């Protein structure tokens, strides 16, 4: 979320009560002085560096003005999907791996209160996109929402702008220890779990949630797995298709975590990650592995938004 939008939201929302939110008020003062997304952050870890960065292009569609989520298609190797931050219409933007504009889909029945993450996955032979409406700067939202839509199919004629995508199911949920801000969400399809990494705590916390709700009327609960103290303000997360690697984006860096076979993610995130080699972007909040899991794409909330590809294996330049 860029500073102007952040400040506007702070001004437009009803102020919390002074007694209950004293600490939050102090955080807000720091944010006002230093800029949204940079307050109370300590230095990120300095682990071994991996990857070869390439500027793949710029996001061509001018309507993608605040890219808060990025996900690789699970149908087409040359396609990425992107979303805008809160305040935009409920739209999915199709983007080439060179940043080319490939069209737009409207998500019928969804609202973009504060869309902050996008994930792609396959489940029971079908490709899906998960849109995470989980942003909560004030940590006041009693419930937040995940929208799951079938990934749109692109014909030879391409995408007609304005076509609709339908919601397959949605998950309304809360966190077991109360409201919090989150921008990093990923899907572990093999385990049928959604992973969520909190943002504004001094030590981010990893949570998990069932991918399928018990029913549409039940408010689910995301359960705490572990604190991840060596990361600062995570802004994005993704898993490889095989579920053996995770990438986490922060305002300063990107980090690669390798999971061992049959290991819980709580143990994976306790180990020291590898740091991705690329120059930090302004307000970087969107990250995705490529189709084959051999590279990572990163973009930012700005215009023009550069699309950076970090190749993880020298011998495999596939996206």
Enumerate the predicted regions with their spans.
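Bacterial N-terminal signal peptides
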Residues: 25-34
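Bacterial N-terminal signal peptides that target proteins for export
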Residues: 11-24
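Positively charged n-region of N-terminal signal peptides that target proteins for export
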Residues: 2-3, 20-21, 70
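Sequence/structural signature of beta-propeller domains
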Residues: 37-319
């Amino acid at each position: 979320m860029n500073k102007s939008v952040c400040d506007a939201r702070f001004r437009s929302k009803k102020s919390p009560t002074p007694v209950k939110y004293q600490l939050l008020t102090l955080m807000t003062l720091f944010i006002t002085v230093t800029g949204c997304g940079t307050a109370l952050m300590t230095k990120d870890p300095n682990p071994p560096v991996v990857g070869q960065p390439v500027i793949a292009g710029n996001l061509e569609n001018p309507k993608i003005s605040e890219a808060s989520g990025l996900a690789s298609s699970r149908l087409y190797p040359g396609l990425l999907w992107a979303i805008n931050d809160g305040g935009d219409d409920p739209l999915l933007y199709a983007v080439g791996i060179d940043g080319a504009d490939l069209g737009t889909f409207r998500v019928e029945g969804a609202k973009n209160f504060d869309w902050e993450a996008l994930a792609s996955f396959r489940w029971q032979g079908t490709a899906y996109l998960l849109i995470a409406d989980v942003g909560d700067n004030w940590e006041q939202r009693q419930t937040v929402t995940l929208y799951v839509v079938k990934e749109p199919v692109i014909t030879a004629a391409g995408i007609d702008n304005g076509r609709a995508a339908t919601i397959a199911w949605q998950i309304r949920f809360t966190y077991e220890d109360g409201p919090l801000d989150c921008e990093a969400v990923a899907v572990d399809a093999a385990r049928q779990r959604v992973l969520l990494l909190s943002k504004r705590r001094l030590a981010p916390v990893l949570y998990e949630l069932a991918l399928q709700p018990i029913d549409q009327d039940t408010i689910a609960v995301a359960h705490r797995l572990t604190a991840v103290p060596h990361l600062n303000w995570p802004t994005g997360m993704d898993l490889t298709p095989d579920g053996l690697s995770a990438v986490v984006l922060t305002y300063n860096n990107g980090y690669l975590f390798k999971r061992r076979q049959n290991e819980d993610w709580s143990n994976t995130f306790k180990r020291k990650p590898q740091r991705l080699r690329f120059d930090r972007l302004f307000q970087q909040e969107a990250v995705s592995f490529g189709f084959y899991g051999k590279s990572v794409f990163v973009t930012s909330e700005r215009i023009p938004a550069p699309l950076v590809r970090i190749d993880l294996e020298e011998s495999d330049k596939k996206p």
